[in-house]
């Protein structure tokens, strides 16, 4: 969505600013550091807002599934939500200098990919001929290094 794209762009900007920072000194370096701090604060605010919206969407989709457990679209949408959340976390990981912190974020991202996988798998169980669902599953399997499953999904996706 729009919020996650904006956050991703801000991480890119932070990466570039921090690279420039190595060649700066004095007031220019301070201004650069202030800009990075401001971007990080903005990302934090937007991330909290995005998390609130995501949580609400997940709750609503789970209600749909309770009422209509064969709704493949609801499972697919949950898969998309978790896959997007993973992508945002991978962006955050890539913009994190502290290796221990980056490893924790990487673990969170992979947990979200596994949630996406479970929902995409359920969607394909309900609607096995939907190539779009298989393409999404292929992407997740590939990201998780599940190459045999990725290959099978690729065939079912008609790729």
Please describe what each predicted stretch is.
Residues 2-56, 84-119:
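Short coil/linker segments at helix-helix boundaries
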